């Protein structure tokens, strides 16, 4: 990395550090709420899952530093629900995505992840949408892929994220752009190479894992070895690929813990609103479709309204079961559909209320 780029990253980190102190104001009955530079989160009883809002007794403090890093949010120990969005494709309008993001932010997720466009379609748009998420007071998790990248391109993109206030990066291998010639994979052949590259620069780093084994890996045990390498290189948390059978996840989680993977594991849940789409996704990814859920898709897959109802109900049931069994972090693949997130969060309202915060 060129010294001047490294210096810019460090300067941006220092500015961010200086701006991470948020004022607290009295808001009735001895409850305080947090404000930050991009706006104000005001609520007499904000949801516990809201990452940007913490309650304090006024006698305890008047000012507090609130972390937007996912590792700190997960360490809080409360049930956590996060959403995933994808940026507009190259030259596509921003407004529909920004509108969806704004609606999702009103559900007070713990964070929102923003995917990384392939083949140059939306890499710059990832930064723009992540910045918009941050402006709404929600921590952003920016996806970053490394296959085909160079030291310079990684430095440039991480600097852009840092300047946008993004502190969380999901480190992924990704795929080579279709127009790349053979041998242009670059110095970052695996996600672990990206983790090692980024670890010194103070980002909170996440990774991906596959309860049913990565499609390119022959054996689950080998896949777990690769995951452990990424964790040892510096991952702070891991998010799973979607699954539709919680028992598969529980067995996988047990294997990870037995093999020394101790970082938080976020369970990835996809509410299915399109029967034909999910059949294709499962074929490509090798995700197991339980007979109980397959019957739902077969029965309602050609009826969008019914499939939406059934998909939301099934995803809600999965999440409730996960929370009941001690899995406190769930990531919902919302596919830019705020209406899906709204319905699920309404179903979980009582569960996410939790105990009063002291």
Would you name each region that the model predicts?
Residues 70, 93-94, 120-131, 150-156, ...:
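Active-site-adjacent beta->alpha loops and helix N-cap segments on the catalytic face
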């Amino acid at each position: 990395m060129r010294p001047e780029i490294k210096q810019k990253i460090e300067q941006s980190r220092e500015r961010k550090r200086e701006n991470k102190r948020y004022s607290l104001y009295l808001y009735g009955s001895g409850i305080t709420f947090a404000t930050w530079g991009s706006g104000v989160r005001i609520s007499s009883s904000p949801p516990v899952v809201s990452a940007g809002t913490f309650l304090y007794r006024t006698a305890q403090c008047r000012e507090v530093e609130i972390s937007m890093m996912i590792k700190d949010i997960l360490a809080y120990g409360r049930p956590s629900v996060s959403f995933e969005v994808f940026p507009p494709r190259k030259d596509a309008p921003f407004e529909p995505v920004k509108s969806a993001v704004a609606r999702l932010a009103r559900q007070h997720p713990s964070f929102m992840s923003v995917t990384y466009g392939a083949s140059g379609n939306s890499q710059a748009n990832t930064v723009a949408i992540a910045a918009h998420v941050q402006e709404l007071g929600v921590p952003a998790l920016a996806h970053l892929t490394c296959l085909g990248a160079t030291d310079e391109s990684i430095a440039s993109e991480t600097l852009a994220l840092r300047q946008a206030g993004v502190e969380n990066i999901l480190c992924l291998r990704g795929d080579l752009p279709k127009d790349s010639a053979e041998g242009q994979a670059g110095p970052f052949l695996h996600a672990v190479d990206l983790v090692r590259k980024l670890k010194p620069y103070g980002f909170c780093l996440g990774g991906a894992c596959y309860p049913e084994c990565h499609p390119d890996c022959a054996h689950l045990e080998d896949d777990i070895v690769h995951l452990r390498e990424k964790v040892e290189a510096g991952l702070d948390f891991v998010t799973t690929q979607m699954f539709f059978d919680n028992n598969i996840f529980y067995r996988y989680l047990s294997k990870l813990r037995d093999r020394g993977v101790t970082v938080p594991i976020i369970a990835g849940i996809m509410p299915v609103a399109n029967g034909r789409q999910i059949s294709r996704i499962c074929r490509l990814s090798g995700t197991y479709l339980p007979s109980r859920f397959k019957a739902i898709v077969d029965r309602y897959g050609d009826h969008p309204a019914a499939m939406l109802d059934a998909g939301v109900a099934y995803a809600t049931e999965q999440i409730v079961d996960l929370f009941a069994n001690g899995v406190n972090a769930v990531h919902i693949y919302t596919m830019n559909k705020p209406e899906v997130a709204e319905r699920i969060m309404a179903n979980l309202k009582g569960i996410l209320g939790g105990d009063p915060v002291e």
